[in-house]
Design a protein with these regions (language model features):
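N-terminal loops that bind phosphate or other acidic moieties
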Residues: 1-194
């Protein structure tokens, strides 16, 4: 998903940034996936797997978004045990913990034209449905759609955080690449879930 979206993410990032967001996302997701495969092969539990994947993402992608995504995976992993398979409620709680770590570390708020503009509606949707009788796939898919809608709406916002803030209104009419990549990855997870 990140690899397929890399050119478009780079293009929209170049409008009011350095144009490397797509590359960073590809490097981060590739490193995290490799680490996760290695952890699975070593029979690591969910906590260890996500902690290692987070460290790999952070190191592989570098930059601010690498640190944010890496921290989010580590925070999500902290919800799990290495001894038992995660429950649906634990998976949702872990995703919310990951989202909270991004807002805590990055300091961005909704309306700043960042990943947070997609992340908060995603997490809010998960919170609303955590006790639902719906399947994890249904709950996650609804949250991913909320993230996508919010990510697209960032085209109407002037950036107040990150590198894009120094470019004034240059990014108006273009969505935030971090919000778009967040929504893409959450939809990829929804598509993967059973």
């Amino acid at each position: 998903t990140a690899r397929a979206a890399e050119p478009e993410l780079g293009r929209i990032d170049a409008i009011a940034g350095d144009g490397d967001h797509g590359q960073g996302m590809t490097l981060g997701t590739t490193a995290a996936a490799k680490s996760a495969r290695e952890s699975l092969a070593a029979k690591a539990g969910a906590r260890t797997l996500l902690s290692r994947a987070g460290a790999a993402w952070s190191e592989g992608a570098g930059g601010t978004s690498g640190a944010l995504w890496g921290g989010a995976l580590a925070a999500a992993g902290g919800v799990f045990s290495d001894e038992t398979a995660p429950t649906q409620e634990e998976i949702i709680t872990a995703a919310i913990a990951g989202a909270n770590s991004i807002t805590d570390m990055g300091g961005a708020k909704v309306g700043d034209k960042t990943m947070v503009d997609a992340l908060v509606p995603f997490a809010d949707s998960l919170k609303e449905n955590i006790s639902s009788s719906k399947s994890l796939k249904e709950i996650w898919n609804t949250a991913a759609k909320a993230a996508q809608t919010a990510a697209e709406a960032t085209a109407n916002i002037t950036a107040r955080k990150g590198r894009a803030r120094t470019h004034g209104d240059a990014s108006l009419g273009t969505p935030d690449p971090g919000a778009i990549s967040f929504a893409l990855l959450m939809q990829a997870i929804a598509d993967f879930l059973q």
